[in-house]
């Protein structure tokens, strides 16, 4: 069995906004979602004393303080007093964003968080939500208390930190009784969650799923760790593909997608947004934090997605790149994209490429989920977003970069892209590519 899989609902909270419409609108409007670390409310208390490890010049991609739904009645259902005690921030963010995706998909009963069971069988409704780190805040704070004060541990400490508890809490809150599944593949987590849901539906194991990832890992310890690993830029500017790029900006956020078989979506007369047609993945088997210089692993993931979709390289119109603004990573990805997608392409069929991370930073585990949503919106709205802070494009051997159409200054509107690729790569050599198709009817 191999069924077609379509996208029917989207939800996200990002440094650009607390909803899909706000985030997408601000991305297209060249808004910068990055914040100087010195402007954080807890800067003096948590960061200033650690300036040797965390320079005051860095920026972060902070989500809005109040990311909850504007409807207070819905908030009371989503976040009970028990939830406040039992759940950590990445779980609460997942609950909030899942509500938006389910509402966007037209699955919820009016003014409620319950799913209309006349539209779907909850026994076949899967929940696939991952996180790269989980709750570093709870681990850090509980460790301090236990070590310094010998205080009793919160009985919910373990359920608050496990990365699968976003999926667990979402499935409980919305009564999703299909499979509960969670991956943690560093910065590829979101793409893997969506890709796995694609396969579960495609193979007939589930009829419908909510899939994505949540990350709220802005914390002195995580920042200090990434700075020590020389991953983060200390000049505060995320510059994907630029010759002056010097590392990523750490961000947080969440993205959720409702996916279902085409038959299931048509049966309930759903509003179909896009179709997922390919999923590729590979391992670099090279280094724990760096890709091979030639981007071979990323290339193989792209080629696998194309093969699954039964498409030619020239069919792809747009690449939403992982491009985190690191020296080695951006170049390796460009080489992979050029090698996999440029052969046979005529000058009349440009390959557009951009990165969202100039505007939102690197959302770690949630990056692929949020960027997949932006990729889907690019196809739906015929607007391919540009890369913020891209002034001087990197160079590649044999002038391959000249053959890629880097989107700068403003979005590309009216090019009518039909197929778009979203890449996400992670520490440990994880490579993932999702291939989306513009929905033009069955």
From Swiss-Prot:
PROSITE patterns the UniProt entry points to: KS3_1, KS3_2
Places the protein is found: Mitochondrion
Keywords: Fatty acid biosynthesis, Fatty acid metabolism, Lipid biosynthesis, Lipid metabolism, Mitochondrion, Transferase
Key word Transferase present: yes
Organism domain of life: Eukaryota
Catalytic activity: a fatty acyl-[ACP] + malonyl-[ACP] + H(+) = a 3-oxoacyl-[ACP] + holo-[ACP] + CO2
One Gene Ontology term from the biological process aspect of the record: fatty acid biosynthetic process
Main location as per UniProt: mitochondrion
GO molecular function: 3-oxoacyl-[acyl-carrier-protein] synthase activity
Additional note from the record: Present with 1660 molecules/cell in log phase SD medium.
NCBIfam families to which the protein is assigned, alphabetical: PRK07314.1
Protein role: Possibly involved in the synthesis of a specialized molecule, probably related to a fatty acid, which is essential for mitochondrial respiration. Is essential for oxygen uptake and the presence of cytochromes A and B.
Name of the featured protein: 3-oxoacyl-[acyl-carrier-protein] synthase homolog
Lineage start: Eukaryota, Fungi, Dikarya, Ascomycota, Saccharomycotina
